[in-house]
UniProtKB/Swiss-Prot annotation:
Molecular function in Gene Ontology: ATP binding; metal ion binding; NAD binding; NAD+ kinase activity
Keyword Amino-acid biosynthesis appears in the UniProt entry: no
GO biological process: NAD metabolic process; NADP biosynthetic process
Protein name (Swiss-Prot/TrEMBL): NAD kinase
InterPro entries, alphabetized: ATP-NAD_kinase_N (IPR017438), ATP-NAD_kinase_PpnK-typ_C (IPR017437), NAD/diacylglycerol_kinase_sf (IPR016064), NADK (IPR002504)
One Gene Ontology term, aspect cellular component: cytoplasm
Similarity annotation: Belongs to the NAD kinase family.
Species the sequence originates in: Rickettsia bellii (strain OSU 85-389)
Lineage: Bacteria, Pseudomonadati, Pseudomonadota, Alphaproteobacteria, Rickettsiales
PANTHER family assigned to the protein according to its UniProt record, in alphabetical order: NAD KINASE (PTHR20275:SF0)
Signal peptide start and end residues: none
Gene name of the record: nadK
Reactions mediated catalytically: NAD(+) + ATP = ADP + NADP(+) + H(+)
Length: 255
């Protein structure tokens, strides 16, 4: 893969401005639209924002970690950044498409790289019905919320909520309840990536619910349909000795 033209994007208000200045001195960067690869300096959040902003260009992303966890990022190695990009391996991600209908009948669509989540808006637990591929699988779940995570997002909010970590090539989605009250011992489900998942919110007046696709939030939702998109894909580049698959395995052993 030809990766001679590199664009650099970052948060100009970043606390890691000294590291960014060092990275800027390494190379003569080009505009994003002309790039072979987009280098994102920051954390996972910065990478996600830029994926959403530029995914339509079909250009690979290479993340450089200036944040804390940086699960989707590569370690900061200023001296070898350019070489690491040239020798990197690519992982392909398919985002989720969320279609949410609010109580006024408006339809909201958004893409999610990590997860789509629904959660209670007040102090009362949410109640919802779950369908998979048009078949009712749970007539009532009482919980703070629920989420559907991609393999790339399974080690983020999903893991903190008690969900499973999914290998990147598993072609599966993880449906995880958030603080499930009834059924109390239900820990979620692993579903094929081809599944269409629908949450129908029960008692929306008394128990209002919001929905998010990554960082995009929509209020007072009455139903949410989630499915993986095959017509859109994102390529993330990882150092050859620090692949995303390696990180997913390591995370399952407390690494």
């Amino acid at each position: 893969m030809n990766m001679n033209k590199i664009a650099l994007v970052y948060n100009e208000n970043s606390k890691s401005s000294s590291s960014i200045e060092e990275i800027k001195k390494l190379y003569t960067y080009c505009d994003v639209e002309d790039a072979d690869v987009i280098m994102v300096a920051g954390g996972d959040g910065e990478l996600l924002h830029n994926i959403h902003r530029y995914m339509h260009l079909n250009i690979p992303f290479y993340g450089v970690n200036l944040g804390s966890l940086g699960f989707l990022m590569n370690p900061l190695d200023i001296k070898n950044i350019l070489q690491n990009i040239q020798e990197s391996t690519a992982s392909t991600l398919n985002p989720l498409l969320m279609q949410a209908e609010d109580v006024d009948g408006q339809i909201h669509k958004a893409l999610a790289i990590n997860e789509v989540s629904i959660f209670r808006k007040t102090n009362q637990a949410a109640k919802f019905r779950i369908e998979v591929n048009g078949v009712e699988r749970m007539s009532e779940l009482v919980a703070d919320g629920a989420l559907v995570a991609t393999p790339a997002g399974s080690s983020a909010y999903n893991l903190s909520a008690g969900g499973h970590i999914l290998p990147l090539e598993s072609n599966m989605l993880c449906l995880t309840p958030i603080c499930s009250f009834r059924p109390r011992r239900w820990h979620g489900a692993l579903l094929p990536s081809s599944a269409s998942i629908k949450f129908e919110i029960l008692n929306t007046n008394k128990r209002p619910v919001n929905a998010t696709a990554d960082f995009q939030e929509f209020s007072n939702i009455k139903s949410v349909t989630i499915k993986s998109t095959n017509d859109k894909s994102i390529k993330l580049l990882f150092n050859k000795n620090h692949t995303l698959e390696d990180r997913i395995i390591k995370e399952q052993f407390g690494g």
